[in-house]
């Protein structure tokens, strides 16, 4: 099998915090499990067909877990159909009405997300815990800076990391007092500084898995930057077991950005990682249009691979050394194609995109075939 060129190491190896492992349906979260990527639907949950269509789009993008809001009885009624047909585990998002949590557990939710700031009294939380236990659901204690309990706001004067962590730990104790330990916690704010400070403090205080995110981060550009800074800082420190990038955009973009963050830190790889120069007067072809076309044409590839698209020979050969496939612009309307870091053949700029797509698809098929062969050999050896 060809050498793995997908991993670009950070300056130091990341040592992940040792958290307790739980399950969200078929997906393990925490411990040594891969860091999962999730998103949330923005359709009306009562419209089961529309919600399922969006879930399928998220599944195709690589989502491990999908959260679905359950604000009313109509939503939890539709949830049963949605959960039955979805391929990924679903988290039911519960606010204000604890009975929606009980209904969602009965309808097939893999996890219940509750907000301590608005779920109600400990007795109501107890009833939700019992429903989760009865139906094999895990739970997420989801604390948001914008919806903290009144007494904590009075105590601290304003939303702050200390208040968020205290809220989370108070509700963790309620779950633990009822001998329920299949839970994870999030402490999110729209300010990356507040978010990171809260998670750092929480990571020292409890061993449960942590769901990372910067809430209400903004539209695609600003939200991506905030999330990359906040989530990236925590992951680099080894904190975090599952992530959700919150964007005011198509939920599929959240999955793409989430995987890009993990790929940038060498924590998880999915699809083609395209390395491209910003282009300048030396470019031998239109780098920007080429990369845009390749991103669209290669979106269906889930096999981890790396591809460098560099406009000239200043950095092109060096970048190609570190990628599975590379293309470097040259003169006379042609460039050099690199395979596994070595010059392989020349290719004219005309037809270059089709040629690169063909090379990537063939390489992905080779990698998958070799992987299947290795797995078959391991199965035989284990028998």
Curated annotation (Swiss-Prot):
Origin organism lineage: Bacteria, Pseudomonadati, Pseudomonadota, Alphaproteobacteria, Caulobacterales
HAMAP family found in the cross-reference section: IspG
Co-factor(s): [4Fe-4S] cluster
Known pathway: Isoprenoid biosynthesis; isopentenyl diphosphate biosynthesis via DXP pathway; isopentenyl diphosphate from 1-deoxy-D-xylulose 5-phosphate: step 5/6
Catalytic activity entry: (2E)-4-hydroxy-3-methylbut-2-enyl diphosphate + oxidized [flavodoxin] + H2O + 2 H(+) = 2-C-methyl-D-erythritol 2,4-cyclic diphosphate + reduced [flavodoxin]
Positions bound to [4Fe-4S] cluster: 277, 280, 312, 319
EC number: 1.17.7.3
Family in the record: Belongs to the IspG family.
UniProt keyword Protease, yes or no: no
Function: Converts 2C-methyl-D-erythritol 2,4-cyclodiphosphate (ME-2,4cPP) into 1-hydroxy-2-methyl-2-(E)-butenyl 4-diphosphate.
InterPro entries, alphabetized: Dihydropteroate_synth-like_sf, IspG_bac, IspG_bac-typ, NO2/SO3_Rdtase_4Fe4S_sf
Enzyme class: oxidoreductase
Keywords for the protein's UniProt record, in alphabetical order: 4Fe-4S, Iron, Iron-sulfur, Isoprene biosynthesis, Metal-binding, Oxidoreductase
Name the UniProt record assigns to this protein: 4-hydroxy-3-methylbut-2-en-1-yl diphosphate synthase (flavodoxin)
GO terms under biological process: isopentenyl diphosphate biosynthetic process, methylerythritol 4-phosphate pathway; terpenoid biosynthetic process
Secretion signal, residue range per the UniProt entry: none
GO molecular function: 4 iron, 4 sulfur cluster binding; 4-hydroxy-3-methylbut-2-en-1-yl diphosphate synthase activity (ferredoxin); 4-hydroxy-3-methylbut-2-enyl-diphosphate synthase activity (flavodoxin); iron ion binding
NCBIfam families cross-referenced by the UniProt entry: ispG_gcpE, PRK00366.1
PANTHER family on file: 4-HYDROXY-3-METHYLBUT-2-EN-1-YL DIPHOSPHATE SYNTHASE, 4-HYDROXY-3-METHYLBUT-2-EN-1-YL DIPHOSPHATE SYNTHASE (FERREDOXIN), CHLOROPLASTIC
Cofactor binding description: Binds 1 [4Fe-4S] cluster.
């Amino acid at each position: 099998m060809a050498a793995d060129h997908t991993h670009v190491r950070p300056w130091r190896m990341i040592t992940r915090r040792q958290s307790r492992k739980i399950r969200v349906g078929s997906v393990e979260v925490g411990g040594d499990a891969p860091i999962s990527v999730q998103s949330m639907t923005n359709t009306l949950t009562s419209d089961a067909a529309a919600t399922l269509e969006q879930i399928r789009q998220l599944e195709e993008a690589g989502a491990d877990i999908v959260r679905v809001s359950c604000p009313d009885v109509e939503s939890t009624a539709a949830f049963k159909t949605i959960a039955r047909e979805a391929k990924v585990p679903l988290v039911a998002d519960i606010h204000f009405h604890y009975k929606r949590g009980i209904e969602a557990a009965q309808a097939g939710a893999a996890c219940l997300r509750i907000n301590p700031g608005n779920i109600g009294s400990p007795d109501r939380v107890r009833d939700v815990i019992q429903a989760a236990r009865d139906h094999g659901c895990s739970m997420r204690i989801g604390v948001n800076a914008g919806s903290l309990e009144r007494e904590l706001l009075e105590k601290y004067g304003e939303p702050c990391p200390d208040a968020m962590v205290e809220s989370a730990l108070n509700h963790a104790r309620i779950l633990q007092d009822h001998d329920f330990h299949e839970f994870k916690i999030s402490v999110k704010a729209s300010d990356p500084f507040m978010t990171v400070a809260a998670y750092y403090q929480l990571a020292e205080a409890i061993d449960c898995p942590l769901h990372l995110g910067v809430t209400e981060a903004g539209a695609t550009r600003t939200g991506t930057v905030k999330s990359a800074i906040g989530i990236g800082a925590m992951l680099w420190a080894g904190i975090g077991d599952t992530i959700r990038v919150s964007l005011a955009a198509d939920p599929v973009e959240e999955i793409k950005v989430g995987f890009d963050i993990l790929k940038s830190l060498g924590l998880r790889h999915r699809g083609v990682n395209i390395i491209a120069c910003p282009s300048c007067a030396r470019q031998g072809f239109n780098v920007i249009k080429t990369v845009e076309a390749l991103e669209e044409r290669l979106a269906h590839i889930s096999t981890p691979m790396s591809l460098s698209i560099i406009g000239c020979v200043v950095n092109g050969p060096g970048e190609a050394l570190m990628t599975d496939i590379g293309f470097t612009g040259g003169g006379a309307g042609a460039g050099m194609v690199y395979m596994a870091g070595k010059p392989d053949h020349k290719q004219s700029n005309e037809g270059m995109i089709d040629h690169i797509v063909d090379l990537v698809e063939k390489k992905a098929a080779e990698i998958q075939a070799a992987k299947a062969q290795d797995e078959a050999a391991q199965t035989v050896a284990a028998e």
